[in-house]
């Protein structure tokens, strides 16, 4: 078993309040398995977000999705197990708003076989072409040393639901810089 104790988030907000307008916690796990029917998609991305904080902090260029991305945040804000999924996932499995998927996370402890922590279900509330912090494609070397493109899939869920399903977990802190400040400060 592994144990994680959450640091005091207020300490970060106090230390960064001069240089950042907004801060938010983001659970980012690129080792999530998405399950649809009998199929599994390993190495998918799960983002656990607080919708209000995330909307105030992150940015996304207009015109990349059918609607403004705030509408997608609003769609999961009132559905505790609501999820936003990437359009490539929806296309691969012919998924629509209202359908359900399951996503699994694994223990960070190194073992011979991955140990699944939990596998909650989520109700699809929105489908997006683009999302802050998500790259649909990664590039890696195969066994022969050739660089190959690998497609990834996204699930965005409510932060509180992710924590209730998987327990406390390390998170990233995302910030939006205040006017007149840069990332090197």
Where are these regions (language model features)?
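Short proline/glycine-enriched turn/loop segments at secondary-structure junctions
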Residues: 36, 112-113, 163
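Short beta-strand boundary microenvironments
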Residues: 7-105, 119-130, 142-146, 150-154, ...
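A cross-kingdom feature strongest in bacterial/archaeal respiratory oxidoreductases
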Residues: 133, 137-140
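Short, conserved charged micro-motifs
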Residues: 4-10, 181-185
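Short aromatic-glycine motifs in intrinsically disordered, low-complexity regions
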Residues: 105-116
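A short beta-strand structural signal in non-transmembrane regions
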Residues: 90, 163-185
């Amino acid at each position: 078993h592994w144990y994680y104790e959450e640091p005091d988030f207020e300490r970060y907000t106090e230390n960064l309040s001069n240089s950042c307008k907004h801060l938010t916690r983001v659970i980012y796990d690129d080792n999530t398995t998405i399950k649809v029917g009998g199929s599994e998609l390993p190495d998918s991305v799960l983002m656990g977000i607080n919708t209000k904080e995330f909307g105030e902090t992150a940015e996304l260029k207009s015109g990349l999705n059918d609607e403004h991305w705030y509408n997608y945040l609003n769609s999961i804000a009132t559905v505790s197990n609501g999820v936003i999924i990437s359009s490539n996932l929806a296309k691969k499995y012919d998924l629509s708003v209202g359908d359900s998927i399951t996503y699994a996370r694994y223990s960070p402890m190194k073992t011979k076989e991955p140990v699944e922590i939990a596998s909650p279900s989520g109700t699809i509330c929105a489908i997006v072409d683009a999302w802050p912090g998500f790259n649909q494609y990664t590039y890696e070397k195969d066994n022969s040393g050739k660089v190959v493109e690998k497609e990834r899939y996204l699930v965005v869920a409510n932060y509180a639901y992710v924590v209730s399903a998987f327990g406390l977990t390390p998170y990233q802190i995302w910030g939006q810089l205040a006017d007149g400040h840069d990332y090197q400060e």
